[in-house]
């Protein structure tokens, strides 16, 4: 996207990849949508994005010798690890910005996804301008090498790249997008770069960052090392690893896997000799792509193994076995560790790494936060659309875990099995979090389960799941939502949700409700030692509470009962289910199963007319053009959704 100029300074670019944040490294507002959104975008040429609160992140001071951009983002994720930037947009500022190369900015922006942010944007500055000028020179070289056109970029009829041109760049840098004077931010986070040391994330969490000297003392042996995927496999990353490993050999018993970020990058690394240096040292070559980072292909971690990777995620089970340990680090540390057979860093002249954590500060801007809270607390009453359940109810399960990620909900190894059934999804749901979860769900015999003999009931009754904060963080895989639905869960209650997961849920008829007070009460009563992230008091990862819970769609009342129809334990208040969410729920539950997925796109195409018409009044009529289009796509329209014919 960046190589081809689709992601460009001063524009907004969306893609169905959770790491679209990476485009922020070139001053582009890159943010993730999900695959249903992408399909709808192709059909309608429109998408939606709710503008989030903005956090100002100051990177101040000079980087010490041996410290890289990857160390910065590992430190940010590991020190500001209390959801400070969850579902926010980030603007990077500070005196440390000019010393960061564009490749380092791309790595940092890439992992703002793991940090919990929706966007991570760097300024459009002289460093970026010089980088683009070098890209234009590379295009000229490729044009010369390929006889008049740059392979993969230029058409045979033109010698000019359709997007990366000197004229377009001149306009961007002549009129850069800058913050408004007096711009207000939700908060300001500051990282003192001078206090930073090479850092390692993990094991199995990006929210745990350890200075490298500490792990070196711990003598952590490794079995596998990875320089793959989108975060740190650009030409400069490959060169950094090659400079560490050149003339050496990968340690006996260690497998070192490499894959370039793209075919263009691999050609560049081959031409420089850096690729050959890695291969000569014993590295195993994989094709460009996600590969081990998402748990696909060869080289995955096996039971009891330890791996270190230059990728962006090390969630439990993501890179192989849930019984393995995965760490994240810079390309230099990964290469040095591959040679040493344990986690170590390279010897860097003048480097004086410390075992102390970095210096940070947080400033909350109360006026902005208060305005956001006031806006959020303004309840808007929504009418109940025909066929939308007025009440969601069922027995309550509790997973006492914060940051329960999409790999935990739906393992990556199943993600690209396009023929997998809903029944199979139900069998593997939450597998990397709790292998017993699917069995528990089967025992509860939810009427909303895909294997229900008469088909899944869409009347709001099922098993309701509660969990901690930042639920669904991680990838954009849609199956994290559909697997929960398939298992018989129509609604999830959490302290907060990852935004990408929430989009997937809305598109697929899984209702998400934020109820922090309920989560704190359940944590006190059922979590081990009254704290999340260590399972329940009974030693189980998933707690079968004794409660029956009800969530009202219109009044937003959450009622906790001792049993179905029993005495009320406590009541909570949340927001009502919005009209747009109801529409999407109806489309996913009634349109898609009867008429097919193409019909959902038509349903979405006419969402504006439906929104004007959704008050349920029989005197209102659906616009004739919308009715004709909908009838053409919905042969069984009356069965699809009575909403359309009322």
What annotation goes with each model-predicted range?
Residues 1-646:
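Fe-S-dependent hydro-lyases/dehydratases of central metabolism
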């Amino acid at each position: 996207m960046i190589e081809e100029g689709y992601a460009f300074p001063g524009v907004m670019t969306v893609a169905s990849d959770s790491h679209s944040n990476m485009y922020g490294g070139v001053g582009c507002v890159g943010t993730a949508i999900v695959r249903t959104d992408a399909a709808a975008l192709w059909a309608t040429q429109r998408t939606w994005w709710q503008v989030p609160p903005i956090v100002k992140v100051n990177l101040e001071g000079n980087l010490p010798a041996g410290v890289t951009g990857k160390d910065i983002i590992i430190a940010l994720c590991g020190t500001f690890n209390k959801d400070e930037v969850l579902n926010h947009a980030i603007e990077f500022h500070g005196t440390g910005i000019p010393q960061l190369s564009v490749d380092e900015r791309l790595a940092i922006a890439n992992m703002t996804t793991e940090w919990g942010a929706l966007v991570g944007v760097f300024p459009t500055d002289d460093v970026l301008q010089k980088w683009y000028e070098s890209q234009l020179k590379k295009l000229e070289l490729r044009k010369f090498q390929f006889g008049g056109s740059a392979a993969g970029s230029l058409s045979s009829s033109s010698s000019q790249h359709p997007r990366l041109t000197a004229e377009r760049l001149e306009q961007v840098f002549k009129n850069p997008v800058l913050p408004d004077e007096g711009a207000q931010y939700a908060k300001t986070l500051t990282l003192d770069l001078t206090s930073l040391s090479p850092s390692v994330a993990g094991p199995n969490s990006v929210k745990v960052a350890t200075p490298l000297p500490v792990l070196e003392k711990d003598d952590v042996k490794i079995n596998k090392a990875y320089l793959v995927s989108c975060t740190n496999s650009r030409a400069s990353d490959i060169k950094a690893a090659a400079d560490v490993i050149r003339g050496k050999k990968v340690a006996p018993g260690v497998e070192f896997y490499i894959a370039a970020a793209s075919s263009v990058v691999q050609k560049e690394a081959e031409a420089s000799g850096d690729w050959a240096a890695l291969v000569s040292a014993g590295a195993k070559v994989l094709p460009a792509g996600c590969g081990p980072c998402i748990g696909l292909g060869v080289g995955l971690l096996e039971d009891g193994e330890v791996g270190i990777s230059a990728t962006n995620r090390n969630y439990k089970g993501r890179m192989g076995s849930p019984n393995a340990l995965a760490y994240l680090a810079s390309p230099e540390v990964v290469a040095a560790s591959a040679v040493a057979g344990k986690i170590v860093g390279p010897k860097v002249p003048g480097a004086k790494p410390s075992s102390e954590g970095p210096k940070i500060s947080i400033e909350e801007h109360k006026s902005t936060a208060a305005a956001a809270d006031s806006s959020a607390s303004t309840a808007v009453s929504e009418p109940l659309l025909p066929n939308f359940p007025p009440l969601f109810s069922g027995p309550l399960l509790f997973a006492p875990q914060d940051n329960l990620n999409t790999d935990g909900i739906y393992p990556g190894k199943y993600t690209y099995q396009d023929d997998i059934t809903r029944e199979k999804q139900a069998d593997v749901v939450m597998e990397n979090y709790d292998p017993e979860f699917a069995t528990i769900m089967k025992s509860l015999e939810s009427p909303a389960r895909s294997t229900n003999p008469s088909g899944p009931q869409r009347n709001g009754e099922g098993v309701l799941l509660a969990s901690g904060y930042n639920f669904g963080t991680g990838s954009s895989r849609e199956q994290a939502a559909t697997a929960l639905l398939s298992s018989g869960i129509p609604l999830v209650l959490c302290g907060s949700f990852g935004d990408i997961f929430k989009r997937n849920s809305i598109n697929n008829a899984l209702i998400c409700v934020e109820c922090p007070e309920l989560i704190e009460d359940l944590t006190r009563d059922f979590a081990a030692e009254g704290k999340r992230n260590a399972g329940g008091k009974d030693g189980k990862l998933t707690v079968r509470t004794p409660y029956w819970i009800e969530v009202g769609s219109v009044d937003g009342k959450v009622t906790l009962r001792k049993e179905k129809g029993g005495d009320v334990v406590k009541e909570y208040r949340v927001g009502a289910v919005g009209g747009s969410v109801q529409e999407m729920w109806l489309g996913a539950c009634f349109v898609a199963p009867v008429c097919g997925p193409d019909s959902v796109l038509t349903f979405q195409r006419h969402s504006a007319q439906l929104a004007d018409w959704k008050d349920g009044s029989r005197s209102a009529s659906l616009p004739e053009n919308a009715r004709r289009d909908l009838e053409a796509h919905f042969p069984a329209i009356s069965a699809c959704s009575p909403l359309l014919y009322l």
